[in-house]
Amino acid sequence: MPAEPLSPQEVEERLATLPGWSLDAGRLTRSYRLGSHFAAAAMVVHVAQVQEELDHHSDLTLGYHTVALAVHTHSAGGAVTEKDVELARRVEDLAAGHGAH
């Protein structure tokens, strides 16, 4: 069963619990700054592991000292769903362990 899109109000409610995350072009987005390129690359690998575990994959971009994510659900027509919120929460939890801010 495909994930159901969240209403605009539901998206705003979820974003209120995810500091640093925002809605941009219909996607949940967040950028993190890390202490080095290696630390950023390590975080990307960790995020990829979580994405595999959840079977839900975001657009994930590695920069010099940065990691950026854009999350939405393809099977829900590109809308934001609870799957996206769960992935954002999991990424937020692991980011602190990588020294991301």
UniProtKB/Swiss-Prot annotation:
Q: Could you confirm whether the keyword Transcription appears in this record?
A: no
Q: Which GO terms describe its biological process?
A: tetrahydrobiopterin biosynthetic process
E.C. no: 4.2.1.96
Name the source's superkingdom.
Bacteria
Q: Which GO terms describe its molecular function?
A: 4-alpha-hydroxytetrahydrobiopterin dehydratase activity
Keyword check for Lyase, yes or no: yes
Pfam families, per database record? Pterin_4a
Gene3D superfamilies the UniProt entry points to: Transcriptional coactivator/pterin dehydratase
Q: Which UniProt keywords apply?
A: Lyase
Q: Which InterPro entries match?
A: PCD_sf (IPR036428), Pterin_deHydtase (IPR001533)
Q: Which reaction does it catalyse?
A: (4aS,6R)-4a-hydroxy-L-erythro-5,6,7,8-tetrahydrobiopterin = (6R)-L-erythro-6,7-dihydrobiopterin + H2O
What family does this belong to? Belongs to the pterin-4-alpha-carbinolamine dehydratase family.
Give the protein name, as stated in the record. Answer: Putative pterin-4-alpha-carbinolamine dehydratase
- Species per Swiss-Prot/TrEMBL record: Streptomyces coelicolor (strain ATCC BAA-471 / A3(2) / M145)
